[in-house]
């Protein structure tokens, strides 16, 4: 995965060098590390549900604000690889998470309002996460490149909570946050995103009747990411145990989760568009 990340950045860097003389310094001066433009759009068009455990998106509102959305994406595209590589890991992650989420909204708008699911943007031969249409770091990247090639690359960030930060425009996905990710608050933001998702009983819960833990399919797909030792956690069961108070109500059930003596079932994933209804 490290080699994959280097390949992505080197490929992007080759293209970046061609235009570095003309736009690199300007991009360095103009880039807003607070991602204020993205926060403004999110605060306008993200609706919190269930006490902030989930969210829906006003895609119609984003469609009306397509120009500022594209301007924000253009600002991200203007950042040269050399500038990005000089940032802190937190600043890099915030940049990539915001780029992923804003690009996903833009992708939805290409077919909205006819679209009922992001999966409709794919085909039998390709998923919507594969095309390399996103201008970033001097090259063309796909959503998969950003998430799996950069954010999830082994030995780089090793941050499993990325799964609670990137949003796939679907009801089953962890919520689209109502503000941009920013470097100076990233640990707190990721902690809150995790708490929100784990407390949402529609997607993660202890089933008292069946005496088993029922988790989002995300943990089935990416369970290995929770074995890397982040915050001392080296197993999915240990991660669940750390969130026992959000997954269960009864003290006995919470104690069982913390003991690790339980089975896990994964819930079906809802790919319906997370549009405001």
Predicted regions and their residues:
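Interaction/scaffold regions that mediate signaling and macromolecular assembly across diverse proteins
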Residues: 30-86, 90-94, 104-277
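Surface-exposed, glycine/proline- and aromatic-rich loop segments on solvent-exposed faces
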Residues: 97
């Amino acid at each position: 995965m490290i080699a994959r990340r280097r390949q992505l950045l080197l490929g992007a860097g080759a293209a970046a060098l061609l235009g570095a003389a003309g736009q690199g310094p300007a991009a360095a001066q103009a880039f807003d590390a607070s991602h204020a433009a993205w926060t403004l759009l999110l605060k306008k068009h993200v609706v919190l549900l269930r006490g902030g455990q989930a969210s829906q998106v006003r895609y119609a509102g984003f469609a009306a604000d397509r120009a500022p959305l594209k301007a924000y994406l253009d600002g991200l595209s203007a950042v040269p690889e050399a500038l990005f590589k000089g940032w802190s890991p937190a600043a890099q992650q915030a940049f990539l998470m915001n780029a992923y989420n804003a690009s996903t909204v833009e992708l939805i708008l290409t077919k909205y309002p006819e679209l009922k699911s992001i999966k409709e943007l794919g085909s039998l031969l390709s998923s919507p996460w594969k095309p390399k249409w996103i201008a970033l770091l001097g090259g063309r990247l796909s959503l998969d490149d950003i998430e799996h090639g950069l954010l999830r690359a082994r030995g780089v960030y090793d941050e499993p909570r990325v799964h609670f930060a990137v949003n796939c425009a679907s009801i089953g996905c962890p919520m689209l946050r109502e503000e941009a990710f920013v470097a100076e608050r990233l640990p707190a933001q990721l902690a809150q995103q995790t708490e929100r998702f784990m407390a949402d009983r529609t997607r993660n819960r202890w089933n008292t009747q069946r005496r088993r833990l029922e988790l989002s399919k995300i943990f089935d797909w990416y369970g290995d990411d929770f074995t890397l030792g982040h915050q001392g956690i080296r197993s999915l069961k240990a991660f669940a145990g750390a969130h026992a108070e959000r997954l269960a109500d009864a003290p006995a059930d919470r104690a069982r989760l913390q003991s690790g003596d339980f089975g896990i079932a994964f819930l079906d994933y809802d790919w319906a568009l997370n549009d405001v209804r």
